């Protein structure tokens, strides 16, 4: 669920973060740009893991967001993925959840195997046609 601008909707944000545990949330993924306070504020309120996604910004390309999320004070950790790294944030959350869900762990293992097979297939094609003809 999107919260929009946390600065303009503080009451909704605080209620959401405070009630996440009782709603059964095991991890929160929070994307934010610029000053990127949303992931850190979630981590300060929510006792489970928080994954921060720094969003690309026009002024600094997302580095401002990245630094804001990565530089959390001691005791308030936020796992941080790459700028616009939503896919990896989802995978990281799935891996956290898989520590207590065998079926999810099996699906993650199958996904990892499919990635490995995809790379092996691409490598075989590269070896066959050479780098000059690879994308033709």
Give the predicted meaning of each segment:
Residues 63-136:
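C-terminal binding/interaction regions
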């Amino acid at each position: 669920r999107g919260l929009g601008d946390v600065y303009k909707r503080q009451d909704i944000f605080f209620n959401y973060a405070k009630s996440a545990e009782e709603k059964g949330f095991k991890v929160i993924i929070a994307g934010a740009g610029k000053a990127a306070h949303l992931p850190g504020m979630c981590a300060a309120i929510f006792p489970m893991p928080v994954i921060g996604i720094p969003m690309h910004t026009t002024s600094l390309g997302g580095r401002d967001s990245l630094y804001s999320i990565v530089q959390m004070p001691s005791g308030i950790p936020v796992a941080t993925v790459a700028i616009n790294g939503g896919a990896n944030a989802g995978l990281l959350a799935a891996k956290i959840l898989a520590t207590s869900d065998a079926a999810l762990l099996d699906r993650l293992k199958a996904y990892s195997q499919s990635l490995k097979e995809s790379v092996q297939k691409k490598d075989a094609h590269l070896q066959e046609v050479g780098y000059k003809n690879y994308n033709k």
